[in-house]
Design a protein with these regions (language model features):
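Non-catalytic positions within long, well-ordered alpha-helices that form the structural scaffold/packing
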Residues: 22, 73-74
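Short, glycine/polar-rich helix-capping loops at beta-to-alpha or helix-loop-helix junctions
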Residues: 64-68
Length: 183
């Protein structure tokens, strides 16, 4: 089944956590459950949480086709992470179905596949922009563990490697300007 909120109590708790975090200035939230963003978007529209809160669907939710991606956009998500091993033609079909940004993993920790997709990145940009590239995951042995200072340096190296591939194979690609992502 994957990560999901179990029961209405967990929905309420997650909404309260978003309210509290937003009072502390947090504006970006990663969600795992399809029901939660539906309610969070309604709360955002009603003014119960700030209108500039950004909700992103986790790759763990299994978004892997245009219909599920469109559903995510319809329920108020601001961006989606499709499954990590999504094929390029599938990614292209998702882009045709939604207007929201897509977050795409360029690599993964060994515990969730351990693959590296750096040479696919230029094509990902061509077919799926606007996209956010999620790079550096291969450095982590497992998903969602704390990052050491050394792993942070290695993650930065992975970012530089992806940037080199983009510069070499798609030099006309445009990056978001610094500060353009406000959440």
């Amino acid at each position: 089944i994957g990560y999901r909120l179990r029961g209405q109590d967990q929905i309420v708790r997650s909404i309260e956590a978003v309210k509290r975090a937003s009072r502390l200035g947090v504006r970006g939230f990663l969600v795992y459950d399809e029901g939660c963003p539906l309610v969070l978007d309604q709360a955002r529209k009603a003014g119960a949480i700030p209108s500039d809160c950004h909700f992103k669907m986790s790759a763990h939710a299994g978004v892997s086709n245009p219909c599920s991606a469109r559903l995510m956009e319809t329920i108020g998500l601001d961006s989606i992470n499709p499954v990590r091993d999504i094929q390029l033609q599938m990614l292209s079909a998702i882009r045709q179905a939604v207007d929201i940004p897509i977050d795409i993993h360029t690599e993964n920790p060994a515990s969730s596949g351990g693959f590296i997709r750096h040479y696919e990145v230029p094509e990902m940009i061509r077919i799926a922009s606007p996209i956010y590239l999620k790079t550096g995951g291969i450095v982590a042995g497992t998903h969602s563990w704390d990052t050491t200072a050394e792993q942070a340096r290695l993650r930065a190296k992975q970012v530089a490697l992806v940037k080199r591939v983009i510069d070499e194979y798609y030099p006309d690609a445009l990056a978001s300007s610094k500060g353009s992502i406000s959440w």
